[in-house]
Amino acid sequence: AKNNQQSGKSQSIVVGTWGAEVTSGVAFDDGSYTGIREINFEYNNETAIGSIQVTYDVDGTPFEAKKHASFITGFTPVKISLDFPSEYIVEVSGYTGKVSGYLVVRSLTFKTNKETYGPYGVTSGTHFKLPIQDGLIVGFKGSVGYWLDYIGFHLAL
């Protein structure tokens, strides 16, 4: 499916993860859906990305996945509402780096076929980028402790 939101039940692969390899946070894997409608997350301009919660599409119906919450407060919330199904993510990028000795995801940017959301957070450290020529992001995975320890994605091909 070439950037086709109606990808149905095609095969999916996991890409990533970016960030920590070992974490004391709570790992999550939302699984695969038919698309992404909304991304809610938190960031702090001094530290890193905090909680994350994604609303997916399941065959035309919104499905709000569980919030993967930070252990701490002091973040700024962001809501990215995509114009589903005509708007979809074509690139995710960000920075990983150390905060208080922990390797975490410090910044995220989501680029769609219509606009760029971000960067949110601290744009220093090691840059990562996932450009998507073919396929579609249909799920998020990662780990959240004090901050977002790492992030990865399910890609429908």
Curated annotation (Swiss-Prot):
Residues with attached carbohydrate: N45
PANTHER family per the UniProt record, alphabetical: JACALIN-RELATED LECTIN 19 (PTHR47293:SF15), JACALIN-RELATED LECTIN 3 (PTHR47293)
Assigned protein family: Belongs to the jacalin lectin family.
Transmembrane intervals: none
Native source species: Morus indica (Mulberry)
Protein name per the record: Galactose-specific lectin
Subunit composition and interactions: Tetramer of heterodimers of light and heavy chains which are non-covalently linked.
Ranges where the Jacalin-type lectin domain occurs: 12-157
Domain of life: Eukaryota
Post-translational modifications: N-linked carbohydrates at Asn-45 can be of complex or paucimannose type.
First and last residue of the signal peptide: none
One of the Pfam families matching this protein, by short name: Jacalin
Role summary: Alpha-D-galactose-specific lectin. Has hemagglutinating activity towards human and rabbit erythrocytes. Is highly cytotoxic to human cells in vitro.
Keywords: Glycoprotein, Lectin
